Amino acid sequence: MIMRTDLYQGHDYYNMDELLTEEHKLIRDTARAWVKQEVSPIIEDAAERCEFPKHLLPGLGGIGAFGPYIPEEYGGAGLDQIAYGLIMQELERCDSGLRSTASVQSSLVMYPI
């Protein structure tokens, strides 16, 4: 198995960090740390084997990637769309399939229910 560390180092060309609240930064940094620790080391090997890393699904739930904008009274985190976008960006920067899984579950499954 090929083990990699963080495969992507983003640059804040437009100084977007200055526009984020501390809560948004915490959400983004939590997702980023999880991706770096759990996804980056295994994702290339999973892609080479044409296997979806199903064992990562509980972790996606753990970082709030499933329906983060669903109101708390319905079991969601009650976050805003910016937080959702930041989580999706962190997933996407490592693996589009993982980001697609989270966004489809959030918008096409959880939200309509």
Question: Positions of the model-derived regions?
Answer:
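Intrinsic disorder at enzyme termini
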Residues: 1-23
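Helix-turn-helix-type domain boundary/helix-start signal
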Residues: 17-18, 25, 50, 77
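Mature N-terminal segment immediately following signal peptide/propeptide cleavage
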Residues: 19-36
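Glycine-rich flavin
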Residues: 33, 39-113
